[in-house]
Amino acid sequence: MSVAAPGLARAENGATLDVRRGMEATFAVTIADGRIALGPPRISRLGTAQPNDGEITVGVEPGGMTPYAKLRVTEKSAAPIDFMATGFIDRIEIDEIALCGRLDRPVTERIAAGSWRVSLNRFAVGTGVDTCK
């Protein structure tokens, strides 16, 4: 994930959201006064939600017989939002990846399929390219 330069927005209070396998979370993202504020998530079954303007949807597709699950991210926010996704089994961290925000197309990345839940955290305004890692 890219290190934010002074003046770039960061999420307030280390905001995090959790998503479980086979589910997706849709949440509002507001950028104001140099801060990113996250709205409460709407949890739904995978593939049933689309973000409205100002929202992001993140879904976790189980990996089946592969060692990786797929994270699907669709953004309709005012600016691309980069964030980290951390996979957990109970309280044990097993994987962590950076997701680069894109407004022009959905993003799909891999995370360990054994993750019972995925914590979305360290939100920051991105550049809209695949180089936030």
Task: Identify the meaning behind each predicted range.
Residues M1-Y68, S115-K133:
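Membrane engagement elements in two modes
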Residues T66, A78-I81:
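Coil-to-beta-strand transition motifs
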Residues L71-A79:
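Asparagine-centered strand-capping/turn motif at beta-strand->loop junctions
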Residues I81-I94:
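Short acidic, flexible loop segments centered on an aromatic residue
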Residues D95-T108:
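Solvent-exposed serine/threonine-rich low-complexity stretches and specific carbohydrate-binding patches
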Residues E109-G114:
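Short, hydrophobic beta-strand segments
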